[in-house]
Amino acid sequence: KELCIRTIQKNVVYLRPNADGVTAHKPAVQQNIVKSTVCAHSYYIIMYVRCAQTINLKTMAERIRIKDIAERAGVSVGTVDRVLHDRPNVSKPAREKVEQALKEMNYQPNMYASALAYNKAYTFYLLIPKHESEAYWEEIEEGARKCEDQRRDFHIDLEIRFYERSNEDSFKAVSEEILDAKPEGVIIVPSSLEVTRGFTDQLHQKGIPFILLDSYMPDLRPLSFYGQDSFCSGYFAAKMLMMLAGNEKEVMLMRQTKDGHVVSKQQDNREVGFRHYMHDHFPQIVINVLDLPLNGTRNEYQKMMAQYFDEHPATHHCITMTSKAHLVGDYLLKSNRRDVQIMGYDMVGKNAKCLREGSISFLIAQHAYMQGYYCVDTLFRAIVLKKKVNPVNYMPIELLMKENIDFYRRTQI
């Protein structure tokens, strides 16, 4: 079989099997087009391309220096430097000439090199609720720490602080500690709107940019937001659930509450989306609510669920808007109930275990690790690199089941 190879460089080596192994030799004459007859167990051809020689020379030739900009604009090098760094003492005509030259030359500053040369240390704070091991918040911490590690050359230091969920005084106390530390940027998982506003108003006054995580409150005017669209997520969850439960008379909605209220704005918005879909498409189906206390014990939860299913034997489908679907899943396994399907949120370890064992049918993943990573990275790009960032960043709504859970990449960025 005739083989034709167009070589980028004149580096063709023939490998020929022999009794001692494989020997290599170069042909005496090297051409840009090499023709050879290749037979089975006879000759092998390898082509080398040295990466160092494939550098785009045009890009190197087009590297723009401050001197080039000054010559193009007809001003001094010092004037160009002041414009690039937005310093004063530049006349309006000179600034316009430089800006026009930058535009014509398509100048792109090397922000990374400038930031490294500046050699300044930056402290960011992450304020999140206290949580137990393997929770959704732990994945956010992991992602945030990963970004901190990857940006260590820029002297980024991430401090994580915790507040008691549904305890406004705890949120206020920790937020005051953060303000006293005078950080360069803050990431906030909000408490109630008004309590969080008291914190963010002070951040605005001090010129400290902040990012909202998990719950979007546009009235607070954050630099950016990361999280799911909670309403759409709840709407989607209802639609998926009713593909299975369309012929049922009732479903169970499990919530986590404190003093009669759900413990997060996100959980509340998901429920609104869920009920909106049910009202529009399945108004005849009864939604039974089971409220589990936030600080309850596992034994208390087991008793409450046993009582619920004794009183509602017709319930065969459950949904929860939190990461605690495993509480119902564990109960179903222990009570050997195989006629109930559960849908919940978050790919935390306990939920994943129940999903694999079959006590949970579906999970909606919201990429907590990714949220934590990108919150820190967004502060880095906005504060250190002086780049514009997207104000709203919704996470994908991803449906997981037993058949595809092993393909979910929890730490993928």
Predicted regions: what is each one?
Residues K1-M60:
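Short, intrinsically disordered or compositionally biased N-terminal tails of bacterial proteins
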Residues T37-N119:
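N-terminal helix-turn-helix DNA-binding module of bacterial transcription factors
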Residues A101, M105, H261-V262, M278, ...:
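Hinge/cleft segment of the Venus flytrap/periplasmic-binding protein
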Residues N110-K172:
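Amphipathic helical "hinge" segments at domain boundaries
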Residues P129-E138, E159-S170, G227-S233, R255-G273, ...:
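Hinge/beta->alpha junction and helix N-cap segments in small-molecule ligand-binding domains
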Residues V186-H204, N288-K350:
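Hydrophobic alpha-helical
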Residues E194-C232, V348-R356:
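Flexible loop/hinge segments that line or gate small-molecule binding clefts
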Residues F225-M252, Y301, H367-V384:
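Hydrophobic alpha-helical segments within soluble ligand-binding/sensing domains
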